[in-house]
Amino acid sequence: MLTSPPKFDDVQIVLADPRAHVRSALKVALTHAGLYNISQANSTAAVRDNLEQSVGPDILICDMGLDDGEICKMVSDLRHHNIGRNPFLCVIGMTWQPEAHQVTQMLDCGIDHLILAPVSPQKVMARITSLIHNRPEFVVTADYVGPDRRMRTRGDLEPGLVEAPNSLRSKAIESWNHRQFE
């Protein structure tokens, strides 16, 4: 069965990095891949403003060191629906500092993917494609809301797992219905 390539016409991206040259290079690469609706942010305050838009973005691609790591708290707040309109927003984090404790903190805030910098456009597009076609179910607890990263050793019954609404997938390969995400 042939599948159509993703359509990115309506996909909204927020690209957050404190370095203008990194944002610019990623924006050019994403534009070449067909992603045109890209907002840029250089601080967590600017990201927060983008998240509060009427429908909000479909993907947040962010440097996890933004504002001295404050972005981790913001992503956690997003996942717990304390900010933004869509707690299930696709989030791709980037880091230049892959120390174990920092990576653990980044994953624990609920990001979907973490890419080690320097970042190639191919890595970013591979993660976007993965979020469209293979996004894992989400664990929803009082302490953590985010992708299920556990190994399947406890059987089929997994309390707290939900299929997260995915506006990226809906816009790229399905029929987009904004009411599903209000």
Annotate each predicted stretch with a short phrase:
Residues D9-V22, L26-L30, L60:
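Conserved acidic segment of CheY-like receiver
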Residues L35-S43, N50:
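Short hydrophobic/Thr-rich beta-strand motif most characteristic of the beta2 strand and flanking loop
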Residues K73, Q97-H113:
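Alpha4 helix (beta4-alpha4-beta5 surface) of REC/receiver domains from two-component response regulators
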Residues V119-I128, I132, P136, V140:
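C-terminal output helix
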Residues H133-E182:
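CheY-like receiver
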